[in-house]
Structures are given as structure tokens and as C-alpha cells.
Amino acid sequence: MFFSKKAKDYFLKTKKNWNKMKEKIYLIIGLVILFFALPFQSAFSQRQKSFVCVKTIKSSQSRIHSAEFSPDGKYILSVAEDRMIKTRNANNYQLRLVIEKHKRFFISTSFSNEGAVRKRICWDKDHQTLDPFSPNTLKGKRLYSADAKTASYSPDGKHIISVLRNGNIKIWDAISGKSLKTLKGHSSYVHSAEYSPCGKYIVSTSSDETLKIWDANTGSCLQTLKGHSHNVLYAKYSPDGRHIVSASRDSTIKIWDANTGKCLQTLKGHSKCVNTVEYSPCGKYIVSASNDKTIKIWDAKSGSCLQTLKGHSSYVFSAQYSPDCKQIVSASVDKTIKIWDANNGNCLQTIKGHEDSVITAKYSPDGTKIISGSRDGIIKIWEEK
């Protein structure tokens, strides 16, 4: 049976149209599958990536005040209630440097990779080198700690800055442990001191209700920032160094112009003391941790609160963005560390392992590890697996 030319053309045209329609149907089906599959894939991926404890260090008999990785990720810096500053190799966790304080002298002890004492040097208040093993130097003297409450690295990792309980701030050589400068000016207890991203300036906070900006090279005070009505507990520069954000016991956060010292905004929302506050690495957001058991995410430009993260059952002592800005890590008195999705505020993981209040938790520079310190003197290293 033969078809007419007209019927044949109609058949071919219909077949061609049907083929095109099938392609569209398959495309639509594929997009629908992809639409529903991506969230599950993302959730599965997030569930697979969790932090597990790879090292527990009994660093002190007392509370850990601060712990962090060096900017290059090679070392670990910590300060405990015993006021000793310690650095360790991040690969084998052996002690590298310990800075102590004698009644009249600062003593730094450096260690080999195997943990043996390699060098011990002593300086007096005028930075003159002394022999710590000389009986005339330390005879009948009791060793005290470096008197430090917290400590952090300079951006280049060459210096360590620590705050002392007598209201002073000290800059140390990160390799030798030598005391380089003492910054004096606060009239009360100093809570924190941090370098600017360029390393040229230092911002400090105090119970005298002020922030101070210092010249990191000369140690001179450049500005005193006033505005908080209670103890200023923490301050941090923005990634571009143009702004400073501060947290206070007055339950507020303030954003300052780092150049003029002018208060640009006051962020209100927490109902209790704000313990720490930091910018996201991209500089667009601010994260804060409070005694009201919450973490808040703020728009750094408008100052509006974008999200409130709830989940901890007690005070939240610290919160920090991951280097890629995708996650936030928090530490709490409830003995847990939590990992949050910085975009939607969901809790991705609750890390348990500490047996006492977790004071601090911070990411490594590459974001694959977290270092945490607790009230019982334990430091833990968590790695993403």
C-alpha cells in the first residue's frame, strides 16, 4: 500500500514534531528530578562532612582563655588561667615555646620537635638578656606566669600580642618569645587585643569602657574610642581594615570608623552581655555570641539583624565564620561546639567531647580543622572527615 506524497509529508512532519516534543518532555523531567535531588544531595553532603576529634591536649590545670592557629596553620597558640603563653607545632602538637613570668623577669623556653628543651632565655623589664640557669638570677625566686589572659598572632605570624591582668598589653617575638614592647594606657582590666589586617595597628578593649587603637610599631596610643556604657569585652577589625566592631557587657555591638574613631552604628538585639563579635571574611556580615544563649548574624552595612541562631542551652562564649563564609562555629558553656549553616542558620552539627564549658572554638586558616579550649584546661583539635 502506497501513501500519497501529501500523507507522507504529513507523517514526516508529525514525527519530527513528536521528536522535538519528546526532547522537551525529557528536559522538563530532568529539571524536575534535578530540582528535587539537589537539596537531598546537599543535605547528604553536609551530613557526610562532620568534624571529629583527632587530638586531645591537656595544656593546663586551669581554664583555657584562648586558642588559635597561626596564620599559616603551622602552629597553635594558647593561653590558660595559669597565664602561660604556649605555642605548639600543629602537625605533632609538641611544645615549641612557653613564655613565663618571673617576679622580675620574663622567661621563654623553646623546644625541639621531639619536645625536649632546646633553648631558655630570660629578659628583664628593660629587655636585657639574662642567664635563667644562673643561681644569682633565680635563686630563691618563685616563677610566675606571663600574666596573660588572651593572646593572638600578628597577620604575618612573626609576633604574638597578649593582654595582661595589670591592664597592660605585651608584644612578643613569636619565635624566641622575647618581650618586645609593653603598651600602657588602659585604666582597668584589658580583655582583648587584636592586630589590624595590615599589621600596622592594634585595637584593645578594657573594663574602663573604652577601646584603644595603637601603633603596632611604636607602641603609642593613637586613639581612645568611647561610647560603651559597660566593660568592652572584644573588638575586631573588618577584613579591609576600615572599620572596627566591638562587643560589650552593655548588650550592644558598635561599629567604628577605624580612621577617625567615630562610632558609626550601635547594633541592638541581644538581651545580655555580648562576649565576642567578628566580621565574616568577605566583610559583608558580622557574627556575635552572647550570654542570652544565641548567636546573631548582622548585615555589616545596614546594621540590621539578619538571623538569630538558637540551639545552645547556656551562654555562648565565641562564634566565628569559616574561611569560606559558608559556616559558623560556636562554643558554649553547655559543653558543646556547634557548626551552623551561615546562609540559612540551620545547625549542621553539634560536637560533643568536652567535659566542661567550652570557652573558645576557631577554624584553621584552611577551614579543615577547629581548635577548641575548655574550662578544664583541655584543648581539642577537630578535623573535617
Regions found by a protein language model. Name each.
Residues 46-61, 138-140:
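A short helix->beta-strand "capping" segment at the edge of beta-propeller domains
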Residues 57-64, 100-106, 144-148, 184-189, ...:
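WD40/WD-repeat beta-propeller blade N-cap
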Residues 71-72, 113-114, 155-156, 197-198, ...:
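Residue-level detector of Asp-centered blade-edge/turn motifs that repeat once per structural unit
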Residues 76, 118-120, 160, 202, ...:
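Hydrophobic beta-strand positions that form the internal "hydrophobic ladder"
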Residues 82-84, 125, 166-168, 208-211, ...:
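Short coil/turn segments within WD40 beta-propeller repeats
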Residues 90-92, 133-135, 174-176, 216-218, ...:
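Short loop/turn segments that connect beta-strands within beta-propeller blades
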Residues 359-385:
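Blade-level signature of beta-propeller repeat domains, shared across WD40, Kelch, NHL, RCC1
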